[in-house]
Amino acid sequence: MASINRPIVFFTVCLFLLCNGSLAQQLLGQSTSQWQSSRRGSPRECRFDRLQAFEPIRSVRSQAGTTEFFDVSNEQFQCTGVSVVRRVIEPRGLLLPHYTNGASLVYIIQGRGITGPTFPGCPESYQQQFQQSGQAQLTESQSQSQKFKDEHQKIHRFRQGDVIALPAGVAHWCYNDGEVPVVAIYVTDLNNGANQLDPRQRDFLLAGNKRNPQAYRREVEERSQNIFSGFSTELLSEALGVSSQVARQLQCQNDQRGEIVRVEHGLSLLQPYASLQEQEQGQVQSRERYQEGQYQQSQYGSGCSNGLDETFCTLRVRQNIDNPNRADTYNPRAGRVTNLNTQNFPILSLVQMSAVKVNLYQNALLSPFWNINAHSVVYITQGRARVQVVNNNGKTVFNGELRRGQLLIIPQHYAVVKKAQREGCAYIAFKTNPNSMVSHIAGKSSIFRALPNDVLANAYRISREEAQRLKHNRGDEFGAFTPIQYKSYQDVYNAAESS
C-alpha cells in the first residue's frame, strides 16, 4: 500500500509547488515585458503644449499634522492619471489606517518612523506573550484565548530617503516616533489596472474623519467619514461582536482630530529587541547600521528566484534610494543616479511603478533623454535646476527653473534636459511603469553613439570628423555630465585620439 501511495504523494507535492510557483511568479515576477504595461491610457485627448511647475494649493490641518494637496484637477494630472499629496506628521503623530483605490509610492523627504501595511490573509507574526506570575494555572480554553497580549502583522521602520510601496487597496498606517516632523510625498497611479473605479483618488478611512480636499471650491465644506459610519450601529455591533457603545466609537461621529492624530504618551509597539535596545541606549550610529542591514537583507538565498522565495507576507515594502552605495551610475565630478525597479524591489511588480533618484553636483547636467515607456513625476528635494522639455513638434513646452518643493510632470516620449544650479540639485522621479526605461541622446550607450558617422553627417549636414566628435565628445560619461565648456570637449577628444 505504501508503494502505491508514494508516487501519488510525490505527484501531489510537485503539483502544489508548480501551482504556487506559477501564482507567485505571476504576482511578483516579470509577467510582462519591460516594454509593456498593464496601465490604462487616458480616455481624453491630451495636449501637453505648456507644462508648468506645481506646488500644493490647499492644506488641511489635523490634530498632529498637515495634508497638502496638489491641483489634481489640472489637465496634466488628469492626462497622466496621477495624484500627488504631501503629508507632514508631527512627532508622536499617527496617520490613521486607510487604503486607496490606486497604487502608491511614498518618498520620505525628512524624518523617521514606523509604518504597517496590512496584507490580507497574512499571519500576525509579531506576538507578545502574557507575563503571568503568582496565578493559578489556566484551563486550556483560557490559555488559548489569553495566549498573547498583542499580535499583529510585521511593522517596518523607515527613515529619510526611503521609498515605501503601497499596492492598491492595502490598508496602512504611519507613526512618527522621531524628534522632527516626518515629511512624505505620496504619488498615486490612478490609471493602474488595479483601479477599476474612476480615475480619481479615493481614500477609504478605517478610523477618524477628514475634510474633503475638493471642498475649497464650494461654499459648504464637506467631510469624509470612515467606512464604519455608513453601517448601522446594530449591524456593526453584531458583525464585530462588540457592544453598541464600542460600535459608535468605531464610527467616530464626533471625532474632529482629522486623519493625523496625536498619541500623547507614544505608541507601545512590538519591535525586534535589538532595535529597542539601540533606541534605549541612544546609539544612533549602531541603529543606522542595524537598519541598513535590515534593508539589505534579501529573501532570496541565491541569485535567482523560483517564485516561492518572496510572497505577499514577506514582501519588502521599503527600500532606501538615497544611499550612495546603491547608485547605479556615479560620476565623481557630476553626481549619481539610483534606480528602483522590479529587479531590486520586487513589490513594484504589484504597484506597477518605479522610481529614480538623481543627485547632481554644482552646475552638472543630466544627459538629454526621453522616457520610453512611462510618464515621469519629478519632485525637487534639494537645490535648484534649470529644466527644458520639448514635444514631438520640436516646441519647448517648459523652460524654467525648478526649486525645492516643486513638482513637474514630464509626459512619455517628451525630450528633457536638466542642469543643476550653483547649489546643486537633487530630485526623485516617480515613473508609471515598474521597469521604466529612458533613451539617452548623448554620452555612453546613447542614441548618438549607436548611429553610424555617415548617418549623423548627412542628417545634420556636418563633416564626418564633426560627427565623430559629436559621438565621442562626452567620452565614457553616462547619465550625469561634468560641467565643462565646448573647448574642453575638443581637448578631451583630441587627447583620446592621440592616445
UniProtKB/Swiss-Prot annotation:
Cystines in this chain: C46-C79, C122-C313
PROSITE patterns reported in the protein's UniProt record: 11S_SEED_STORAGE
Chain ranges of the Cupin type-1 domain: 51-248, 319-468
An example Gene Ontology biological process: seed development
Gene Ontology MF terms in the entry: nutrient reservoir activity
Alphabetical UniProt keywords: Disulfide bond, Seed storage protein, Signal, Storage protein
Subunit relationships: Hexamer; each subunit is composed of an acidic and a basic chain derived from a single precursor and linked by a disulfide bond.
Function, in words: Seed storage protein.
UniProt-listed PANTHER family: 12S SEED STORAGE PROTEIN CRB, OS03G0336100 PROTEIN-RELATED
Name of the protein in question: Glutelin type-A 1
